[in-house]
């Protein structure tokens, strides 16, 4: 039983290890051929380049509080981004826990407007702010004047979904395997049966039936 899994690089956790099994239960969150995630490092480069391109604006990026936020922060650090990263209150304790387990996330500060030496418009120029996706459309995000709104998610492959969320900077960074990685994992596990759940089951089941007949010919 795989649960949620990804095959892309993540500096904050151990990689997924396929184990040969008779029955494999896989998720199918991105179980359609349209979902082919780019290399995660390319998305970090897009974010860094955008921050440099718009030094007078802040970037507010939607990330899930557990896992996605810490992965993005750590990858930014590994790319040499040493500036303070500002985080929503819901991320604080989880990031502190990661630090206790030895994950160096660099300097983080709460994304507040109190006790700052300048007004928010001036203080947050050129800064990176991370928040849960729900906060992007909330009153919370309106404290940052003229922000560039981004979202780090596999769903950003779908341009219409990004548009609906008011996302200016879609970053295709996912903690779920895409179509190709799901199929690669199935081949590596080499099961006699595949059970598919949570997502686009029919398309993946159809593809599995074809591939399993070749694996166990």
Name each model feature, range by range:
Residues 149-187:
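A C-terminal functional module that forms or caps the active site or interfaces directly
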């Amino acid at each position: 039983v795989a649960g949620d899994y990804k095959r892309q690089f993540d500096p904050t956790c151990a990689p997924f290890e396929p184990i040969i099994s008779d029955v494999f239960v896989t998720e199918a969150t991105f179980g359609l051929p349209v979902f082919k995630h780019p290399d995660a490092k390319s998305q970090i480069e897009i974010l860094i380049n955008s921050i440099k391109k718009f030094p007078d604006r802040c970037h507010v990026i939607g990330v899930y509080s557990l896992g996605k936020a810490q992965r993005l922060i750590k990858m930014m650090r590994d790319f040499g981004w040493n500036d303070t990263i500002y985080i929503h209150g819901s991320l604080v304790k989880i990031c502190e826990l990661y630090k206790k387990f030895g994950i160096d996330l660099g300097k983080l500060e709460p994304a507040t407007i109190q006790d700052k030496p300048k007004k928010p418009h001036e203080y947050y120029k050129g800064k990176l702010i991370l928040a849960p996706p729900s906060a992007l459309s909330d009153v919370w995000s309106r404290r940052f004047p003229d922000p560039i709104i981004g979202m780090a998610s596999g769903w950003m492959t779908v341009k219409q979904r990004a548009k609906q969320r008011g996302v200016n900077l879609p970053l295709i960074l996912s903690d779920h395997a895409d179509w190709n990685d799901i199929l690669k994992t199935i081949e590596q596990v080499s099961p006699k049966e595949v059970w598919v759940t949570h997502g686009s089951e029919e398309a993946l089941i159809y593809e599995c039936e074809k591939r399993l007949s070749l694996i166990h010919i």
